[in-house]
Amino acid sequence: MSDMKKVTLVLSDGTKFHGKSFGYDAPVAGEVVFNTAMMGYPESLTDPSYAGQLMTLTFPLVGNYGVPPFTFEENGLPTFMESDKIYASAIIVNDYSEQYSHWNAVESLADWLKREKVPGITGIDTRELTKVLREHGVMMGKILFDDEPDNIPEANYEGVNFVDQVSCKEIIRYNEGAGKKVVLVDCGVKANIIRCLINRGVEVIRVPWNYDYTDTDFDGLFLANGPGDPDMCEDAVNIIRKQISQSRKPICGICMGNQLLSKAAGATIYKLKYGHRSHNQPVRMVGTNNCYITSQNHGYAVDAKTLGNDWEELFVNMNDGSNEGIRHKVNPWFSSQFHPEACSGPVDTEFMFDKFVETLK
């Protein structure tokens, strides 16, 4: 620990937290957010939804099970990660464990961060930082090295189309010839979403976020997760509107997909004070007493009161009452704000994939 450089996290309101660098030694700026999950840092770091963000982990000890190998399955999906690289701009922890032990680990978290050129800081009171963000809302911040001048520009999060940065640039097919065809709109899709569809025997046609698929031959539409503000994705929303105006084909959405489908249904989106990023968010299925523990990662939410008359809420968050999913009253169109594929987190709601695939038949 003695050879780690001293760094300071400076929030946009001037609040400072002092720590040490254990990742790539470079200053960085971004939106500071917090995640209260106890595990899953390899999956979270490679989740494209964290693009542009400095990810704070509230669990005090991080790194003690190392990092799994970057291997790929026959279908081209990463075996243990959620994409092919780290998307978070930095990771902020309280106590980084230099020693790691796990049957599947091949390197330390520090070595992985350095190889991918991603900063990491330790020694921060992450729970105090979380209290600040919870009280004042998420804010922009910088990680600066104490012996270097502040010479990096301020970062922007609002008004940036992160989806365009992380989406695929060409069509990718999985499980070709398997049967029913699903067009998956890639806003920053996690690998396990594709895996959950493949495992249910469908062919997945992964298309860029602004690709017009309305004249394509397919059986169902899947709207994937992704980073940033859904209001930056008007092209995707307009294509969804076009699709639902001309076809009753099944539609399912997750996270950003819930927001884009809601916008196509006439709803407005607002930014949450500090977002939902954890493995233990309770949601209730509307019209039932069924409550599920879910994995979540989003900073924006749907204003359910603004949904069109043909739509209704499907899930509601039990902590703050915010929307967690919508459905059409007649057609097989539904979505969830949470992540039924988890990875990491609970798999209580994986039945959402079953329901979607059943509607394809």
Residue ranges and their predicted role:
Residues 8, 282-284, 314, 325:
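Residue-level detector of beta-strand face positions
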Residues 181-186, 294-295, 334-338:
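Active-site-proximal beta-strand elements of phosphoester/diester hydrolases
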Residues 325-361:
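A glycine-centered loop/beta-turn motif at secondary-structure junctions
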Residues 225-304, 345-355, 359:
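Cysteine-nucleophile active-site neighborhood
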Residues 2-210, 230, 238, 343, ...:
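RNA-binding accessory domains that recognize and position tRNA/RNA substrates
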Residues 119, 181, 250-252, 268, ...:
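Proline-centered loop/turn at the N-terminus of a beta-strand
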Residues 290-331:
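Catalytic beta-strand/loop cores that center a nucleophilic Ser/Cys/Thr
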